[in-house]
């Protein structure tokens, strides 16, 4: 990144930066090959049509030499389909392989302007760095603190863009390098044409996994545009509760913008959109799923839905389906978010109050944030990963039968520990114990398949060693948070809720 900053400092005008020459630098492809961004708990890297996606500086240098040839990038995109199913001998010399390398390098390059802007912004504002803020589990303590005091919630599925050109137009506001935008069009149209011509579901799945980094960058840019005005209203409304002189200046500027937005809405939508002034609006998003909660009435949530539909319709030129936005009362509704079923439970309490010689009972109600592990989607994910059947019956993992016993146990144990780590915030962990039981029997069945034996005597022979391997992580976490003098069993601690602040990505099984 330091080399990139030195390159961009050569020209002081930020609008004259040309990013495409960075494709000729070897360190760009080294950054793109960083496998730490694409780790998986399954230890199964994605293979492209049966071949290993190897990295070599020799291949990078050969690619850079070819890129100096005239019209190489055009042939690279147009002819990559013809060489996709070539033989193993010419795979590393094919246009398809070079197309993969260029697209991954390009995904690193387009992130540079945003990364530098983020770093400079944090340095100017002197924002302290905190590793805990990067944890996706930090969302749940926020929901636990807020949802129990709110009335209505709207879970939203953000629509997908109907055309790739919308993604390019969004980036035009941030990237002034026209050749780089044209190259992005080449790659987007290549993937679009492939999805139209190839009919195999497995092949389409592999194509969708070719460049996760570029895909998520484009998708996050698109989503940030979808929620831009919502974030603006929410942030500026918070100033209404402030009393500082600087905030008063912000208020007048905010009122001017609100009037301007109302005029624009009247001209474009032919109907007046209600500017939302309620500061008690809470918005949370992860990937394509968003939650909008408020203490206001059901009518207020309908106004927000009307605002979203019209904004998406006139700004992104597509209709939003009604099923993508559900409005419900929190007390009667549970919604799926990031691998949990979230809701609010009503807990009645009787409080005894004594005044002088008279005593009486007061009935009160306390709303409690509830988190449940959905067992059916998790079993479906295990079935999809070939750990069990659709009904939850454990089966062996034949692809792991050739591994060493230690490696098989380590892989199953890693999956169990990751699931326990991610679902440690559940209020009821019986479903998690069932999932771990399925994985334990699946691991035993895989070992029995390797040794050509049955699972029961093999599990009896391994005994507590295999059990300890599968449950040691949860025991360590619980012993860290609770005193050693506290007596509890593993299954008796199912009511303890622990949010981990070191999780930077959602679990693979949960995300399926």
Curated annotation (Swiss-Prot):
GO terms for biological process: mRNA processing; RNA splicing; tRNA processing. Its main location: plastid. It comes from the Eukaryota. Disulfide bonds: none annotated. One of its GO terms (molecular function) is RNA binding. The keyword Plastid applies. The keyword Plastid applies. GO terms for cellular component: chloroplast. It is found in: Plastid, Chloroplast. Keywords: Chloroplast, mRNA processing, Plastid, RNA-binding, tRNA processing. Usually encoded in the trnK tRNA gene intron. Probably assists in splicing its own and other chloroplast group II introns. Belongs to the intron maturase 2 family. MatK subfamily. HAMAP family: MatK. This is Maturase K. It comes from Lilium regale. The lineage of its organism: Eukaryota, Viridiplantae, Streptophyta, Embryophyta, Tracheophyta.
């Amino acid at each position: 990144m330091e080399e990139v900053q030195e390159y961009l400092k050569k020209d002081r005008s930020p609008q004259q930066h040309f990013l495409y020459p960075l494709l000729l630098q070897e360190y760009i492809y080294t950054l793109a090959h960083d496998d730490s961004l694409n780790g998986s708990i399954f230890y199964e890297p994605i293979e492209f049509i049966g071949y290993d996606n190897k990295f070599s500086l020799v291949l990078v240098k050969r690619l850079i030499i070819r890129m100096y040839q005239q019209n190489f990038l055009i042939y690279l995109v147009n002819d990559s389909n013809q060489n996709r199913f070539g033989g193993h001998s010419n795979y590393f010399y094919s246009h398809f392989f070079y197309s993969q390398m260029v697209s991954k390098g390009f995904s690193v390059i387009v992130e540079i302007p945003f990364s530098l802007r983020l770093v400079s912004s944090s340095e100017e504002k002197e924002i302290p760095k905190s590793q805990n803020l990067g944890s996706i589990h930090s969302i749940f303590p926020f929901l636990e603190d807020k949802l129990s005091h709110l009335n209505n919630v709207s879970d939203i599925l953000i629509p997908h863009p109907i055309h790739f050109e919308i993604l390019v137009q969004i980036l035009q506001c941030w990237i002034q390098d026209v050749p780089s935008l044209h190259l992005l069009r080449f790659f987007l149209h290549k993937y679009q044409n492939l999805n139209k011509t190839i009919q195999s579901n497995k092949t389409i799945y592999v194509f969708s996994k070719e460049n996760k980094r570029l895909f998520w960058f484009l998708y996050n840019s698109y989503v940030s545009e979808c929620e831009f005005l919502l974030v603006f209203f929410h942030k500026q409304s918070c100033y209404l509760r402030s009393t500082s002189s600087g905030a008063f200046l912000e208020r007048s500027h905010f009122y001017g913008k609100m009037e301007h937005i109302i005029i624009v809405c009247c001209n474009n939508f032919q109907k007046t959109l209600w500017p939302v002034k309620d500061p008690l609006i809470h918005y949370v998003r992860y990937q394509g799923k968003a939650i909008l909660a408020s203490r206001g009435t059901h009518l207020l949530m309908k106004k927000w839905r009307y605002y979203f539909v019209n904004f998406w319709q006139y700004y992104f030129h597509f209709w939003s389906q009604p099923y993508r936005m559900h409005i419900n009362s929190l007390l009667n509704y549970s919604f799926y978010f990031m691998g949990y079923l979230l809701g609010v439970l009503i807990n009645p309490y009787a409080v005894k109050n004594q005044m002088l010689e008279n005593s009486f009972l007061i009935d009160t109600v306390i709303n409690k944030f509830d988190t449940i592990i959905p067992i059916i989607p998790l079993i479906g994910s295990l079935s999809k990963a070939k750990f069990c059947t659709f009904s939850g019956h454990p089966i062996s993992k034949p692809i792991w039968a050739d591994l060493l016993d230690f490696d098989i146990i380590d892989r199953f144990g890693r999956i169990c520990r990751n699931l326990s780590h991610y679902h440690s915030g559940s209020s009821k962990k019986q479903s998690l114990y069932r999932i771990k039981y399925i994985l334990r029997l699946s691991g035993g069945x895989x070992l029995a398949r390797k040794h050509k034996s049955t699972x029961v005597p093999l599990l009896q022979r391994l005994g507590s060693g295999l059990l300890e391997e599968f449950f040691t992580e949860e025991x360590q976490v619980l012993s860290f948070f609770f005193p050693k003098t506290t007596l509890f069993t593993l299954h008796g601690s199912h009511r303890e809720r622990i949010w981990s602040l070191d999780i930077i990505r959602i679990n693979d099984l949960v995300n399926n």
